[in-house]
Amino acid sequence: MAENREPRCAIEAELDPVEYTLRKRLPHRLPRRPNDIYVNMKTDFKAQLARCQKLLDGGTRGQNACTEIYIHGLGLAINRAINIALQLQAGSFGSLQVAANTSTVELVDELEPETDSREPLTRVRNNSAIHIRVFRVTPK
C-alpha cells in the first residue's frame, strides 16, 4: 500500500497561521435517539452522569425507564465516556452491564484565507471514538 503522497510536514509547512484561519466543523452525527448520550468536555461530569442515570431510572414524569443507553465519546471525551459508564455500573450493584465499541471518525477542518488572493482549503483528519452500550441485566 505504498502511495506517493507529500509528507505531512511539507503540507503543514505550506499553511502559515497568519494566512489561514482554522475552522473545525462539527463531527457527523447519526440521527439522535432518545437513549443516546453524547459526552463532551464542556458539560459538568456530574450533570452528564445524572442525565444517564435519569434515563435508566425512568425520569421524573413517570416516563418509561430505558433498558439500555448508548454513551458516545469523541477524542478527549473518550475517557469521560468510559468513566461515566463505569460509574453507572458501579452504582447499580450488578444490575447494569457495559459493552464498548471503538471506531475512527473522519473530521473535516476548513482553512479560511485571511486574504482574497488565496483559495479556501479543507483538511481531513481522523479522530478516535467510543460507543458504550449500558444495559440492564435480567436476574436469573
UniProtKB/Swiss-Prot annotation:
Gene Ontology CC entries for this record: cytoplasm; multimeric ribonuclease P complex; nucleolar ribonuclease P complex; nucleolus; ribonuclease MRP complex
Signal peptide limits: none
InterPro entries: Alba-like_dom_sf (IPR036882), Pop7/Rpp20 (IPR014612)
Protein location: Nucleus, Nucleolus; Cytoplasm; Cytoplasmic granule
Any GO molecular function: ribonuclease P activity
Top-level division of the source organism's lineage: Eukaryota
Gene Ontology terms describing biological process: rRNA processing; tRNA 5'-leader removal
Subunit structure: Component of nuclear RNase P and RNase MRP complexes. RNase P consists of a catalytic RNA moiety and 10 different protein chains; POP1, POP4, POP5, POP7, RPP14, RPP21, RPP25, RPP30, RPP38 and RPP40. Within the RNase P complex, POP1, POP7 and RPP25 form the 'finger' subcomplex, POP5, RPP14, RPP40 and homodimeric RPP30 form the 'palm' subcomplex, and RPP21, POP4 and RPP38 form the 'wrist' subcomplex. All subunits of the RNase P complex interact with the catalytic RNA. Several subunits of RNase P are also part of the RNase MRP complex.
Protein name in the entry: Ribonuclease P protein subunit p20
Species this protein is from: Mus musculus (Mouse)
Gene name tied to this protein: Pop7
